[in-house]
Amino acid sequence: MKFAEYERAVAETDILDSQDLVLPMLGLAGEIGSLAAQYKKIQRDHTGYRAFSDEVREELGDLFWYATALARRCNLSLEEILSDNVRKTRERFLRPATPPPHLLFDDSAPPSQQLPRSLDITFTDSLVEGKGKSPVQTVRIYRGNNAVGDPLDDNSDDDDNYRYHDVFHLAHMAVLGWSPVMRSLLKMKRSTDRDVDRIQDGGRAIAVEEGMTAYVFSMARAHSFFSTAAAIPAEIVKACQAMTAHLEVSRRSAQDWEYAILAGYRVFEELTANKGGTVHLDLHARTITYSVPRSGDAEGE
């Protein structure tokens, strides 16, 4: 039986109030409780309880009935719900080891306004006098011998290494092909297209990326900065997608975001452990990798 046929057939048996959402929800909760009760029975009598499979089949059928009733009251199609769930779970749990190739957002822009397809950025970490009561640990980033952006410290009472957070923008650039922050710092805004310059590369997009990066960092602290994680909590990925829903990066998938976040925090861990180093980006391969500091890098250039 197809799901659409099932939905039509059980609709005739739905005698609950058509506006009431509570009863279908309570029904779902009740069926979950019944399944748990069946599990308890088989745990108590492993060999003697022979009705387990039949009872589970019936409880699952009732669970589907209540799920369909709830979907109907929310004007949702169970078939569409399940189709979306298949896409989401395959994307989340069947993630290839490396991200597949994709088109870059600025492929049609003049070369001078395209993000560099290959890039090395060096992070230097040094103590700077005069920024506080005590010397402050400060990071500068360089492209070759040229400084990029301003010196950054943690701006926090805690030494949490946020001064290295530009690595997350670089990960967005490498894996997503997107970073309004890095596009601005590298002076590669798409100024020949006024709307793209204003919307995709403008101040709001920059603020969104900075805010999103700070949010993910605050969540990462509770997860040991994802140092042992093979996946990113789904709510973090959903928040990133929600914050960027009006921007071109909305075309990237949850899987893409997961690649970018994991890659960024992997390199962040290496940068902080070694107090600097060089980060290598390849936008075609969608990779961000790390090299240990050269002699003198930790003292600045």
Tell what function each PLM region has.
Residues 1-60, 64-301:
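Flexible "arm" and connector segments at domain edges
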